[in-house]
Design a protein with these regions (language model features):
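ATP-dependent NMP and nucleoside kinases share a basic, alpha-helical "lid"
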Residues: 28, 96-139
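ATP-dependent small-molecule kinase phosphotransfer cores
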Residues: 36-110
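ATP-binding Walker
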Residues: 11-12
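Post-Walker A helix-loop "phosphate-sensing" segment adjacent to the P-loop in P-loop NTPases
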Residues: 22-31
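Walker A/P-loop
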Residues: 15
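The Walker A (P-loop) glycine that initiates the GxxxxGKT/S ATP-binding motif of P-loop NTPases
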Residues: 8
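Extreme N-terminal starter segment of soluble prokaryotic enzymes
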Residues: 1-4
Length: 139
């Protein structure tokens, strides 16, 4: 199994690269994000206050009025993500990803895992330790 991490600045095209690779490669691909579990967690926190579709880029720009005038969904994602990393373990989200990758490997039907939101050194290290490679997208 091939693991390809994709890094780059915000809106540099990381997901676009993953989508093209998945679409035009002959490999059976799946795309995972380190932020998937974080978004699920934050979505659950926000359910009582309305519907926030975390899969949409525009959602990150929405303000959460009861959290303060300028507090956005992006701020919530950053704060919650960092809180888990700082309070529990720096590898909190990495460990979740390792579990997801192990489940996919066990299933055996996927050739390539694409991870288009590699940001932190421990995320790079995890991919390298699992025999993968990391691509950098420049715009």
């Amino acid at each position: 199994m091939v693991i390809i991490g994709i890094s780059g600045k915000a809106t540099s095209g990381k997901d676009t690269v993953a989508n093209y690779y998945s679409r035009f490669s002959k490999a059976h691909c799946t795309t995972l994000h380190f932020a998937d579990s974080l978004k699920d967690c934050c979505q659950g926190l926000l359910i009582p206050f309305g519907t926030y579709d975390m899969s949409l880029q525009e959602t990150k720009k929405l303000t959460i009025p009861w959290m303060g005038k300028d507090y956005t969904v992006r701020n919530l994602l950053q704060d919650v993500g960092n809180a888990f990393r700082q309070s529990i373990t720096e590898d909190f989200w990495v460990n979740i990803m390792i579990g997801k990758i192990a489940a996919i490997k066990k299933n055996g039907s996927i050739d390539t895992i694409l991870i288009p939101d590699v940001r932190y050194p421990n995320e790079f290290k995890m991919i390298k330790d699992l025999g993968g490679e990391v691509w950098r997208v420049e715009r």
